[in-house]
Amino acid sequence: GTMIVSDKSRDIREGLVTGIAGRKDFTVITLEKDMMNTERGFGRKVLTVFEEYGVSFEHMPTGIDTMSVVASDKELYGKKEEILNALKKSVHPDSVVAEDNLAIIAVVGRGMVRAVGTAGRVFSALSREKINVRMIDQGSSELNIIVGVDNEKFEAAISAIYNEFFN
């Protein structure tokens, strides 16, 4: 198993991944809108819709013209179509699409911020096993890299990443 602890005094060698964890059964809702990044309040409006339906988000990867919200299938159960319609009314996106069957994997390590090529190694390990990466999320702190893969590839993806860094 994987332990995630707040004790920074443990012997964590710089540049190494210290943990891999993940879960299945997520949906990613992706909104596209030209020049979305210039529209004040866009992100707040999107999150307000999720809040109004009592849905917490797991991750929120964004780009200049796209914003994705990842939530568990359990939280979205019976609400997905209503949320999609509410998003259309609230922010008038060019498109809004929900894709399910997503597993999320977190690759964690304090030293990743100074290690060149860690993300490349993650993606290479997945590519070697013919596992498509459906989503990527990495904050500027570089404490973790989040990847989304098909539910069916979850165990194989965990194994591939584990073997890359721990074998």
Regions inferred by a protein language model and the residue ranges of each:
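C-terminal catalytic "cap/lid" subdomain
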Residues: G1-S140, N144-N167
